[in-house]
Amino acid sequence: MAGSDPGSRGSSPQPPHSDWGRLEAAFLSGWRNFWQSVGKERAAPRASAEEVDEEASSLTRLPIDVQLYILSFLSPHDLCQLGSTSRYWNETVRDPILWRYFLLRDLPSWSSVDWKSLPDLEILKKPISEVTNGAFFDYMAVYKMCCPHTRRSSKSSRPMYGAVTSFLHSLIIQNEPRFAMFGPGLEELNTSLVLSLMSSEELCPTAGLPQRQIDGIGSGVSFQLNNQHKFNILILYSTTRKERDRAREEHTSAVNKMFSVQNEGDDQQGSRYSVIPQIQKVCEVVDGFIYVANAEAHKRHEWQDEFSRIMAMTDPAFGSSGRPMLVLSCISQANVKRMPCFYLAHELRLNHLNHPWMVQDTEAETLTGFLNGIQWILEEVESKHAR
């Protein structure tokens, strides 16, 4: 709840080696700074004479720090509603410290982020005085840009002709969209995402058609979403089943045989990779990519290597440019603590990609979040074809 002491939250602190734990500590510090800042003397917006008369016994008579403290218990939606009631409240509810607090509080709990809504991490890590440099910084606009509810509302307000065009185009597509699925989350989790997909009644999995096989890879698995949208997933593992199982049992990383090293890197740069010929054939024919990331909070990552492999797979030299990529921020089960999807997006440097992407929180056991992600990438493919 807004206004609760962040230090009293139920989640236990992460061990010092956790990637997410370090930033989480910075976020909690940001929360504490908010409560300290509202206790300082601040200038309240000047209310008009009419507003003073109308609200003489209301919140406007309270000190501004008390007003902000009370406002922090409202939801962002309620704040926006309050701001529409008068000029005084329209200015007051835009307070940057208040909206920075909402960002710090809500951002880790949001289940998806995309290439249009990823916030700049620096504006959250730095003290507010360094971000604003004495000027007004619109944290309210940043919050609205990132908020999943706002994104859904914007999406639902698209012109109807766009949906009709996309639907008509889908009628003449001969083959269902094909996606290459890869990433450490396919192999490192205690619960197999692939086994959950294969047993899903909502997705109706069937074996791929033999005539559409790719040498050394297979034909993938065809699925049907909502009994109407068909798509095909080519599941790409880094190595053999035996080697993957051994690596998972020993908590080590198996040698990834999908890629060959072009240049050895160091701790800062990482290595550069290229895909092997069989994988290149996959990249040439797919309509998009599904990257399964291990989002369990205790996991240590080689972020630079993961980014380099994503870049190698999505190289536009192997297919059309602008193909979308869905990143499944995956954990085994609901009781496993996860790193927030926005943090994972930053660490994977997804803002450096030149094509649409979305990160979606997913649970391997229940497939929670998976259908939302698939629906997004199917819409992106249809939109691309319609253009």
From Swiss-Prot:
Post-translational modification: Phosphorylation at Ser-11 varies during the cell cycle. It is low in resting cells and high in the S phase and the G2/M phase of the cell cycle. Phosphorylation is decreased during late G1 phase. Phosphorylation at Ser-11 promotes homodimerization and is necessary for optimal ubiquitin ligase activity towards CCND1.
Gene3D superfamilies assigned to the protein according to its UniProt record, in alphabetical order: 1.20.1280.50, P-loop containing nucleotide triphosphate hydrolases
Modified residues (Phosphoserine): 11-12, 48
Superkingdom to which the source organism belongs: Eukaryota
Gene Ontology BP terms: positive regulation of protein ubiquitination; protein polyubiquitination; SCF-dependent proteasomal ubiquitin-dependent protein catabolic process; telomere maintenance; ubiquitin-dependent protein catabolic process
A GO CC term attached to the entry: cytoplasm
Keywords from the UniProt entry: Cytoplasm, Phosphoprotein, Ubl conjugation pathway
InterPro entries in the record: F-box-like_dom_sf, F-box_dom, FBXO4, P-loop_NTPase
Entry's localization field: Cytoplasm
Domain F-box: 56-102
Pathway: Protein modification; protein ubiquitination
One Pfam family hit: F-box-like
Tagged with keyword Phosphoprotein: yes
Physiological role: Substrate recognition component of a SCF (SKP1-CUL1-F-box protein) E3 ubiquitin-protein ligase complex that mediates the ubiquitination and subsequent proteasomal degradation of target proteins. Promotes ubiquitination of cyclin-D1 (CCND1) and its subsequent proteasomal degradation. However, it does not act as a major regulator of CCND1 stability during the G1/S transition. Recognizes TERF1 and promotes its ubiquitination together with UBE2D1. Promotes ubiquitination of FXR1 following phosphorylation of FXR1 by GSK3B, leading to FXR1 degradation by the proteasome.
Assembly and binders: Homodimer. Part of the SCF (SKP1-CUL1-F-box) E3 ubiquitin-protein ligase complex SCF(FBXO4) formed of CUL1, SKP1, RBX1 and FBXO4. Interacts with TERF1; this interaction is prevented in the presence of GNL3L. Identified in a complex with CRYAB and CCND1.
Protein name in the entry: F-box only protein 4
Organism: Bos taurus (Bovine)
